């Protein structure tokens, strides 16, 4: 609480000009307690030279011109967009044209990837429908299923 009070006091004092601060101190020393009137309170205007503490920093003209110059090159502009998209793993290549080509390849592959289906919960499992022939099951399940089924059938014939 004390830190918050000190920070508020510092901001209040830093925004006062020296003459306003001197008048405030003299009023406090004289012990004049005036009634507060919101309409009579004059808020001192901030001069152009002072910058509000919480306001934005002034823009640097050279920085702005550098940004415009960087976007004048279409390869640099596209590369900055790809870096924002996360396709910036091509720093070992020197040419920005080559970097751009690989970034396009990466994004094309990413856009053509199969859409992953969410994992099904147990209540979303499909129920088994009807009796299917062994050939259909073997074709669906693959070679290992066919081999194990054949092996069981062969052993059943020997026992019988």
Curated annotation (Swiss-Prot):
Keywords: Glycoprotein, Host cytoplasm, Host nucleus, Secreted, Signal, Virulence. It is found in: Secreted; Host nucleus; Host cytoplasm. It comes from the Eukaryota. A motif (RxLR) lies at residues 27-30. Residues 1-21 form the signal peptide. Glycans are attached at residues 39, 131. Its main location: secreted. GO terms for cellular component: extracellular region; host cell cytoplasm; host cell nucleus. Secreted effector that completely suppresses the host cell death induced by cell death-inducing proteins. Has the canonical translocation RxLR motif, but lacks the canonical EER motif, which characterizes most oomycete effectors identified so far. Belongs to the RxLR effector family. This is Secreted RxLR effector protein 83. It comes from Plasmopara viticola. The lineage of its organism: Eukaryota, Sar, Stramenopiles, Oomycota, Peronosporales.
């Amino acid at each position: 609480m004390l830190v918050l009070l000190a920070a508020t006091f510092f901001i209040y004092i830093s925004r006062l000009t020296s003459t306003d601060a001197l008048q405030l101190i003299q009023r406090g020393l004289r012990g004049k307690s005036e009634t507060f009137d919101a309409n009579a309170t004059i808020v001192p205007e901030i001069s152009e030279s002072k910058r509000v503490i919480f306001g934005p920093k002034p823009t640097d003209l050279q920085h702005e011109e550098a940004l415009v110059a960087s976007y004048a090159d279409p390869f640099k502009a596209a590369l900055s967009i790809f870096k924002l998209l996360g396709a910036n793993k091509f720093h070992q290549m020197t040419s920005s044209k080559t970097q751009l080509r690989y970034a396009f390849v990466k994004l094309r592959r990413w856009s053509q990837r199969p859409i992953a289906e969410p994992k099904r919960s147990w209540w979303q499992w499909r129920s088994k429908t009807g009796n299917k022939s062994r050939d259909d099951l073997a074709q669906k399940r693959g070679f290992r299923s066919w081999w194990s089924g054949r092996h069981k059938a062969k052993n059943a014939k020997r026992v019988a």
